[in-house]
A protein has these predicted regions:
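Domain-core detector
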Residues: 1-160, 168-236
Length: 236
């Protein structure tokens, strides 16, 4: 495959995904890219610095994610038999997988937008939707609260695919010190792919995502493509 052509495909997917993110911030794509490119934060209030941190992290992560995703799709197509229909793989990645991924990008970004505008002393409580679709492991975390300043990254939704949990302000004292064996709750509930959070400047999709496990021969071309795209937006 031609690397320049492949890079264009990757960048188109990354920008589409980033578009899902920036609309949650109430800005358009061009404005978001200007914010990412501008490294001078000296004139920004704290909430705007957090906002920029989230946008930079999102674009950085989504470029890597799109590079890995398109590479995985190419690998799957390579493994096909001649009689197999490539449209099946296109549909799988560009419709089935992408729909779930875009939904999680939207949700992680919505949480981040809300987060950056909260004072550090706010107490935040983890909540579920309270219906039959809630996973038992997520229900076990309901009501757990921390100050924003020390809120664990792993507890910021989404913490798994299609997670609908959310955070609310609590006006009682944080209760995390009252909870026994928090480590086991984490292990049961949190998908490692989501152990970091955009709200704290982490990636949307973590390094544990299977897309990032690729054939060794693709690693260097992937790094080159990702770096080329990021350099356009002053991400180093």
């Amino acid at each position: 495959i031609d690397l320049e052509e492949f890079q264009e495909i990757v960048e188109a997917r990354a920008m589409f995904a980033f578009g899902h993110c920036v609309r949650r911030f109430g800005i358009d794509l061009n404005e978001a890219l200007d914010i990412v490119r501008n490294h001078d934060e000296s004139y920004l209030p704290p909430s705007e610095i957090e906002k920029r941190k989230a946008l930079v992290s999102a674009l950085d992560n989504l470029v890597d994610f799109a590079t890995a995703e398109e590479t995985q799709m190419y690998m799957d197509m390579e493994e096909q038999n001649e009689d197999d229909d490539p449209e099946r793989i296109f549909y799988l990645y560009n419709n089935i997988y992408a729909t779930t991924e875009n939904r999680d990008i939207d949700y992680a970004s919505s949480i981040a937008v809300w987060w950056v505008n909260l004072p550090e002393e706010t107490t935040l409580m983890y909540m579920t939707q309270g219906d039959e679709r809630v996973r038992d492991s997520h229900r076990a975390l309901e009501g757990l609260s921390f100050p924003k300043s020390s809120f664990p990254e792993w507890l910021i939704p989404p913490i798994d695919w299609r997670c609908r949990c959310y955070l609310v302000e609590s006006f009682t004292r944080p209760n995390y010190m009252d909870i026994q064996d928090i480590d086991s709750l984490i292990g049961n509930a949190v998908n490692p792919i989501f152990k970091r959070s955009l709200a704290k400047g982490g990636p949307i999709f973590g390094e544990d995502h299977p897309y990032f496990t690729v054939d060794k021969r693709f690693i260097q071309p992937m790094k080159t493509i990702s770096s080329n795209i990021k350099s356009k937006y002053n991400i180093v």
